[in-house]
Amino acid sequence: LGYFLFTHFILKKNLIKKNSKIINVASGAHWGVDLDFNDLQMKKNYNGWIAYKKSKLCNILFTKKLSQILKKDDISVNCLHPGFVQTNFGSNNNCIIKLGIRLAMKFGGININEGTETLLYLIETHNKITGEYFYKGKVSPSSNFSMSKINADKLWNKSLEISAKYL
């Protein structure tokens, strides 16, 4: 709910003007999961990796819904997958998982400069493109679940419900 609450606060304070851009970070990790709208916080069956994947799916759905809302104000809202960036991601896992992630990053990851290329691209261009998922500097496909307007609407409404006491 971080993106959801933060964006609501800055919109309430009129800190976002016409022709602005909102760029959210998602991930290719969103593939292969969906959401249980009756248990978004995974209280029944929590798994850290699945929670991460679902949070990135939520970022895409949030981006799609927010882009619909702000389109009339000429505010573009997009999200991106930065790639498998060599960071300390996964350092809070047990030794075996941590080692696996480190090896994967060493041999298949990209450096931080490469990971920021799509972000910089979105900052510099595409004022009129909105509601899209970008990877490697271009609009890329995301999962079928993430493309559903119905799912975006459901997540938006559930997010309003969960965060009502903070808004």
Task: Enumerate the language-model features and the residues they cover.
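Rossmann-fold NAD(P)H-dependent dehydrogenase/reductase core
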Residues: 1-89, 157, 165-167
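Short, glycine/charged-enriched secondary-structure capping and boundary segments
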Residues: 36-40, 92-96, 148-149
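A short C-terminal helix-loop "cap" of Rossmann-like NAD(P)-dependent dehydrogenase/epimerase domains
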Residues: 42-43, 95-105
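C-terminal helical subdomain
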Residues: 55, 102-151
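C-terminal amphipathic/interface module of NAD(P)-dependent oxidoreductases
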Residues: 144-167
